[in-house]
Amino acid sequence: MQHFSRTFLAASIATALFAPYAQAEAILNNSVQEMPTTDQCLVDAEKNDANAEIVIQADNLQAINGDKAIYSGDVEVTQGNKKITAESVTLHQQENIVVAEGNVTFNDGEVKASSSKVTNNMTSETFSLENTEYQFLCQQGRGQAAYIAKTGQAVYELEDGSITSCPADDNAWRLVASSIEVDQNEETATFYHPRFEVLDVPVFYAPYLTLPIGNTRKTGFLFPSVNYGSSDGLEIEVPFYWNIAPNYDLTLTTLYMQQRGVKQDADFRYLSDGWGAGELKGEYLPGDEKYNDEDRWGYQYKHDGIINKQWLVSLDYSQVSDIDYFRDLSSDLGNREDGQLMQQGKVAYRSDFWDMSLQVRDFQILLQDNNQPYRLLPQVKFNFYTPLLGNYLNFDVKSELTQFDIQDASKPNALRAHVEPGLTIPLSTSWATWTTEARLLATYYQQDLDRLTDPTLKSQLDETVARVIPEYRSHARIYLEREAKLFEGYTQSLEPQIQYLYVPEEEQGNIYNYDTTLLQTDYYGLFRSRKYSSIDKIAAANQLSYGASTRFFDDEYKERLNISFGQIYYIDKKTKLTGNQEETSNYSSWAVETDFNYEDFLFYHGGIQYDIDLNAMQLANSTLEYQFTDGFIQGNYRYVTKDYIEDTISFDELDKITRKGISQAGIVGAYNINRHWSASGQYYYDLTEEIDLEWMASLRYQSDCWYIGFTYTNQLVKWRNDVVGGDSNNPVYDTNISVNFGIQGFATKNKAETAAKELDSTDNAITYGRPFYLNN
């Protein structure tokens, strides 16, 4: 057989077999862009034209004019995005079919393969491959098959095939089936008689299975995840995703727990046309084998929507079967530290100058004590606001009508009506602001005392109370800036502010507390107009608040340091928080806040409230975090006196929580050891009770297609004999050692994270946070 140069062969074939395209072929062969030199997805490329030029290059040619041509020796066949290489290729001219044999490779921009034989119909764009290894280029997935046929534009049928998301030479897991149908347009793979293999060992079989293979929403099973823990034993989670419609979907998850039974979860999501979006979740565990065969269940419904740009609709309703639900079960409905579940609905309307809302609110209490909050059945709010003299005088009215209801007969039900008109003079320049405000707080109570079982409380309260209290506030702030002298190259700002607040004293002992708590008096709280969160208690005030903030900015105007400090001078000592007539000072505690960022790897935040009367700290918190290339380490501390807690929250049995206040220290860290291994951990200790609060350590391996994690947790769940400082010296802990395994690549419910990322998603009571408040 005569040998020809490759260029001469290409021109000869084009002339002899495809004369109409000879000129085009000559041009194409002078180009260096016949095909991409690397394997890449060409799904967005222009589709192949069945009449497009066919370019064949080979070392040898045996041609039968008008019938077929046989090419051999480094054969390449290209047509548009298609490319076939083989030891020999036979072109059947009449049928427009190419048959390639011997070390065949195939690439059409969507899939690449190596086979012993490939048959390609250039007209219908169908092909078949025998004894093939393949890889999808536009989605994750590769595998092997005895026979592959492309029967549609993006439909592949495989016989005796396998598929995995693992890279080449890695068969950590794979799905093997007698028949597989892959639809790349629909991004689904249908398996007949599939078996799931781990390291070539079968671990699961099903007669039929459909899985998504892309990132779009497709109906089908998602890959299961496996976990083993000392608390619940072996756990296997199998999710099924149902793409009901473009704006509706449903995820059904079956969770098998060796020591508990089978738990069913459902998550329905929707997006309505003009009504907003919502989500309905449900969980059900029949006959919990670990807890006396009790049926455990929970559900949650949330909806938020804005209608016609003016109406707002919001619904948030959750309920579980028992108060220990989150303590005993891992749930998407809440966390183990939740003390109550919200059950509320709200409808609101807003216009340019007024808004109104109707709200109902209830709670499911998840605590054993009797500290029940009030229900709002309902609460109606109306607000009006308008400028009177351009930008120099504003008028507004805040009002509400609330019905408070509670099942506890030791507390009264009540109707509260409140109207609060106000005038505001806002003055501002580029370097200063001055706001003066006068308000009138008028409130009416109708309290139901007939049902009270507490005679002492009944004698203190009045059935009807009308209260009118004026309020005056004037707040000024200046912004100054200069080149810093202490730190060269930095810009320093100074922001002093001062506020005068006057609220006359009013006897309010005849009003019960329905929804009011004391607000935290940190630096920013010094300049509020109210000390309480609501209006059941209006604290008297005749005081001057003053303070300042200074900030340092680098040459890119990135904030690197700020310090804020201030306090209150009580002109009338009787208006101090404690109301103690024996107070020796007219000054409040000093409030100090600071944040620091050094070169974006060392961060610090600290805050204190220091009582100058007692020469003691009331509240403090401090966090220092060091970040490096592959991880971080953080130390934190928080301190609150018991007196401060008693003044701030209402809790009948505070000794069950603390006897000396809060003094807790913790350390949190995470490190990516290398590309695959990562570790994280955290530890918290209570310095007042001298006991551990929480341990957590995690080690995780993550490959390209699977992951495995090992986690140890030890969490405090019960104080000594239910009372802090009780006779027992042995607090109760919940200890769990778990191993979880999962698949990555496609058709997974949750993507695996590194151990560092998992600090944000664990069920720990104290989660990782970054309380750094610099303006960057």
Swiss-Prot record:
The keyword Ubl conjugation does not apply. Pfam families: LptD (PF04453), LptD_N (PF03968). GO terms for cellular component: cell outer membrane; transporter complex. GO terms for biological process: Gram-negative-bacterium-type cell outer membrane assembly; lipopolysaccharide transport. Keywords: Cell outer membrane, Membrane, Signal. It is found in: Cell outer membrane. It comes from the Bacteria. Belongs to the LptD family. PANTHER family: LPS-ASSEMBLY PROTEIN, LPS-ASSEMBLY PROTEIN LPTD. Component of the lipopolysaccharide transport and assembly complex. Interacts with LptE and LptA. This is LPS-assembly protein LptD. It comes from Vibrio vulnificus (strain CMCP6). The gene is lptD.
